[in-house]
Amino acid sequence: MASGVRQELAQLMNSSGSHKDLAGKYRQILEKALQFTDAEQLEALKAFVEAMVNENVSLVISRQLLTDFCAHLPNLPDDIAKVVCHFTLEKIQPRVISFEEQVASIRQHLATIYEKQEDWRNAAQVLVGIPLETGQKQYNVDYKLDTYLKIARLYLEDDDPVQAEAYINRASLLQNESTNEQLQIHYKVCYARVLDYRRKFIEAAQRYNELSYKSIVHETERLEALKHALHCTILASAGQQRSRMLATLFKDERCQQLAAYGILEKMYLDRIIRGNQLQEFAAMLMPHQKATTADGSSILDRAVIEHNLLSASKLYNNITFEELGALLEIPPAKAEKIASQMITEGRMNGFIDQIDGIVHFETREPLPTWDKQIQSLCFQVNNLLEKISQTAPEWTAQAIEAQMSQ
């Protein structure tokens, strides 16, 4: 019974003997407490914890036995382990400096329980309580990096990218010191996700694209990273950085396997995209990517409007706001506002004549335009040749040989 355990502990605390003998006797009591079930087990373990944090018990024995106690936590039912962990943390608090290592183990296990229950915020907050930088114990770099990444990931699951960013920034200070390649990958994935959640889409796309080339990452996960890179690029604000990223992805043959390749192709080739062409792509987006902007439009709508405006600037020398609004499928006033913002931010070349209600686009140089069109044509021809060679390899070989012999 639990009361018997409590009595044995009281007697042992008042007895004398060597540390080794006393530790052995306390360990026997712990084993006995673990044999109980349900409420009896809970009460017996609480009694054991109270004895271990009592100042009458040698600190050497307390630390040793609490370490053993922590090792048994994963074997307990989650509901009992959860109560025991909270009880232990509360009782240890006045002497927390003496038991930093044991507290860290308890918090790690408690966070695992909360994570199983999908209580992301409590799991994160439990880990935050580990004094990684301020405690007396010196934690190794990998342990600190792993813990910060866990906290950031848990806050992301709880839809709190602000807190996640705070902890990924702490991880950033450590990641160069770690030689653990797996942790480095976890850091890159987590950092890309934070940028994605924070709507820093072009930076997120660059990180995801980098991950898609890492040989240590499984092939299916590399393709998943590439998909996220493509989605983030499409959602990014129009401009030179996005254009470069579109070019990188368009030239990556793996993108042809992705469902959003059609949108990528239209964007890279500066084609106008209509609203009805976006429904399938919109369904692929994650919840945070479907959020609305300050003017009430979705992130995707805003990105496509900016893309279409940039495409229009390459088709027209100038256009009235009425015509521009009709082309972009938005009110003229909104078209003017977006055009003005893009010109001001240097993402589009041109100027606005508000008296006549016209936006003038900077004259395009014909040579770069021709170069891009020729490049696009060559790319399409190359794709056709590859498909022909896959379907009829013998005919292709004969045709190439005949061409070479001329």
From Swiss-Prot:
Keywords annotated in UniProt: Cytoplasm, Cytoplasmic vesicle, Nucleus, Signalosome, Synapse
Keyword Nucleus recorded: yes
A UniProt-annotated Pfam family: CSN4_RPN5_eIF3a
Subcellular location: Cytoplasm; Nucleus; Cytoplasmic vesicle, Secretory vesicle, Synaptic vesicle
GO cellular component, one term: synaptic vesicle
Ranges for domain PCI: 197-366
InterPro entries: CSN4_HTH, PCI_dom, PSMD12-CSN4-like_N, PSMD12/CSN4, TPR-like_helical_dom_sf, WH-like_DNA-bd_sf, WH_DNA-bd_sf
SUPFAM superfamilies in the cross-refs: Winged helix' DNA-binding domain
Domain of life: Eukaryota
Cited function: Component of the COP9 signalosome complex (CSN), a complex involved in various cellular and developmental processes. The CSN complex is an essential regulator of the ubiquitin (Ubl) conjugation pathway by mediating the deneddylation of the cullin subunits of E3 ligase complexes, leading to modify the Ubl ligase activity.
Family named by the database record: Belongs to the CSN4 family.
Name of the protein: COP9 signalosome complex subunit 4
Organism per entry: Danio rerio
